[in-house]
A protein has these predicted regions:
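Generic N-terminal initiation segments characterized by hydrophobic and/or small/turn-forming residues
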Residues: 6-9, 16, 42, 95-98, ...
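N-terminal single-pass transmembrane signal-anchor helix
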Residues: 1-34
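Alpha-helical interaction segments
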Residues: 19-20, 39-40, 50, 76, ...
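Membrane-proximal N-terminal amphipathic helix
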Residues: 37-63
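Generic recognition of well-ordered secondary-structure surfaces with a strong bias
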Residues: 25, 30-33, 42-49, 128
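Periplasmic/extracellular, small/polar-rich flexible segments of pilin-like filament-forming proteins
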Residues: 58-147
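Phosphate-binding glycine-rich loops and adjacent basic patches that engage nucleotide phosphates
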Residues: 6-16, 53-65
Length: 147
């Protein structure tokens, strides 16, 4: 007669218990992956805003640095700039300079600033100020949906 091979009930219970413990310790780590991804996306947006603002200002300087608010051309896209040469904090300004804005960023404009929320979290923001071309971020896993 052939002896049957397989796992005993005790061995199966031990393996399930070990897998449960591993899952309980690993799950919180995976929960923060989404908020960390939002922080990374926000940092990418901040870098894009800085680059777009600097490129628009460089175009303004190359065009003669006129003091009045004018438009500069960036890859065929008209970008409105202020008297200091920075893109204005609205759709014809900084948003036009970006040329593409992913749907995960929602922009709002108020008094020369453009505020973009990341991933739908109100505290997870990137703010562009048109007066001096400054970009300030409020990005942390806690602000962007994490614990």
């Amino acid at each position: 007669m052939k002896k049957q091979a397989g796992f005993t009930l005790v061995e199966l219970v031990v393996v399930i218990a070990v897998l449960g413990i591993l899952a309980a310790t690993a799950l919180p780590r995976f929960v923060n992956v989404q908020s960390n991804a939002r922080v990374a996306a926000g940092n990418g947006l901040a870098a894009s805003l800085r680059s777009a603002a600097n490129l628009a200002r460089a175009s303004w300087i190359a065009a003669g640095s006129q003091a009045a608010q004018v438009q500069v051309q960036m890859d065929g896209q008209a970008v409105t700039v202020n008297a200091a040469g920075w893109p204005t904090g609205d759709a014809p300004g900084i948003t036009a300079a970006l040329q593409q804005l992913d749907g995960q960023f929602v922009g709002g404009y108020n008094n020369g600033t453009a505020t973009y929320t990341v991933g739908g979290f109100a505290a997870c923001t990137v703010v562009y100020t048109a007066a001096d071309g400054r970009v300030v971020t409020n990005l942390s896993p806690a602000n962007c949906g994490g614990n």
